[in-house]
Amino acid sequence: MIKKYKLMSILAISFSFITCGQKTDHQQLQSKTQLSKKQQTMDVSKITDPAVKQAIEALQAGDKRWYGFFTENPVMTDDGNTVDFKSFFSNALGKESFLSIDRVENNGQALYGKFNAGKWGTFPVFFKFHKNPEGKFDRLDIGQAR
């Protein structure tokens, strides 16, 4: 009888240690929500070009409105290499975002800041937006800021 009691006590304590170390679904969702709110509320007040500001707000939110700020087939470079805009952002939108905007140049169309690039890590970047005469972006140059 005492052996059964000891065994049951050991099992109960073991299970309590296991369950205490796990996050509940609610805790995991809360963590993700806090990160999402942080991304969406990053300070964009330094961005002086209204279209760039709105585009960055869409990027931060992982919102497909991002695509609407660009022409049908914008030119895009990543560290000087031409890449397909739609393909690039089909993988990045909602997974990558600015952590801070540190510097703005070229009438609000060139941004420099800290960027979380998902699996690639966090590093300083630039985003340079180029507008066509109709006000849509027809080119985006991004890359690591030096």
Outline where the language-model segments fall:
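Acidic surface patches and DE-rich sequence motifs
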Residues: 70-71, 78, 117, 132
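Short beta-strand edge/turn micro-motifs at domain boundaries
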Residues: 122-146
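Bacterial Sec-dependent N-terminal signal peptides
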Residues: 1-31
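Surface-exposed, charged secondary-structure patches
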Residues: 86-130
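Hydrophobic/anchoring residues in structured secondary elements
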Residues: 76, 103-106, 142
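Short, low-complexity N-terminal intrinsically disordered segments enriched in polar/charged residues
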Residues: 20-61
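Short, well-ordered alpha-helical segments enriched in acidic and aromatic residues
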Residues: 51, 61-77
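Mature extracytoplasmic domains of secretory-pathway proteins
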Residues: 72-79, 84, 94-95
